[in-house]
Design a protein with these regions (language model features):
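Nucleotide-activated chemistry modules centered on ATP-dependent adenylation/adenylyltransferase
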Residues: 2-269
Length: 269
């Protein structure tokens, strides 16, 4: 943070006719609350969306923005394969924070075609099939929402996986049309996240008490032993480097990684 406790003014970034404020050069020195405040004040609440999967990180961020005068739009994606505990949590979150969480859904015709061609559990077949499922059920609905804004807030943390260890607190997302990607908890540890949740007595997914560190679609999430990489509970039949849905890492890159490590991956049981 610059002298005086305020961020350095952002210049304007221009690409393909779109004008967007550049990221403050001292952003990595900001705390989580400051990251959110700078994003809201620079872009405006109507041009910023908080994307939540209702994971622990999202709960912390919702609490951080709940006492701000201006709040971003909040969205979540119902993929059609979420566990019941996640649906229950959504109602608890709405009640606790008094916010309108907009539920995005995949195109029914796209889901129907995919299931007809490859079956309901195609994600076990290959990385490409799994990415197709993630893209139709999760990525595309959120991508449509991101096309309407200048920035999105995520719960990404560097320690979550090998694909996220370089996550900046504020970055530019070119995959979704040149927008800010706001990661206020990038440098937080899992312990810090859970300490915050328990200290503030915030709601969370009860599956976390059953050994699920990461909760996504029901068939693609599982409980794991303590001390294991958090993302190993997601898409565990794939190599660690490919365990992303395509929202935060380009799908083509994930697919290439998956194919290059195919000989290291055990078939799904």
């Amino acid at each position: 943070m610059s002298t005086g406790g305020t961020p350095r003014p952002a210049a304007t970034f221009v690409s393909r006719g779109k004008r967007l404020p550049t990221i403050p050069s001292d952003a990595e020195a900001f705390g989580a609350h400051m990251v959110l405040r700078v994003a809201l004040e620079t872009l405006g609440p109507s041009r910023l969306v908080l994307s939540t999967s209702l994971g622990p990180e999202s709960i912390v961020i919702l609490d951080l923005v709940s006492d701000m005068e201006a709040r971003p739009r909040v969205v979540t994606v119902d993929t059609g394969r979420l566990p019941e505990q996640t649906h229950t949590l959504l109602e608890r979150v709405r009640a606790r924070f008094g916010i309108d969480v907009e539920v995005l859904e995949p195109d029914p015709s796209d889901v129907e075609e995919m299931v007809r061609e490859r079956g309901p559990d195609l994600f076990y077949r290959s990385v490409d099939d799994r990415l197709r499922c993630c893209d139709i059920r999760k990525v595309e609905p959120l991508t449509k929402a991101l096309r309407q804004v200048d920035g999105w807030i995520t719960g990404l943390r560097r320690e979550q996986s090998t694909t996220r260890w370089k996550t900046p607190k504020l970055g530019l997302d070119l995959e979704h049309g040149l927008i800010w990607k706001v990661n206020p908890l990038a440098d937080w540890s899992s312990e810090r996240v859970w300490h915050y949740i328990r200290t503030r007595d915030l709601p969370y997914n009860t599956l976390h008490d059953m050994g699920y560190p990461s909760v996504g679609c029901a068939p693609c999430s599982r409980a794991i032993p303590p001390g294991v990489d958090h993302r190993s509970g997601r898409w565990w039949w794939e190599t660690p480097e490919s365990r992303e849905c395509g929202l935060h890492v380009d799908s083509a890159q994930i697919s290439a990684i998956g194919r290059s490590h195919a000989h290291d991956v055990e078939p799904a049981g």
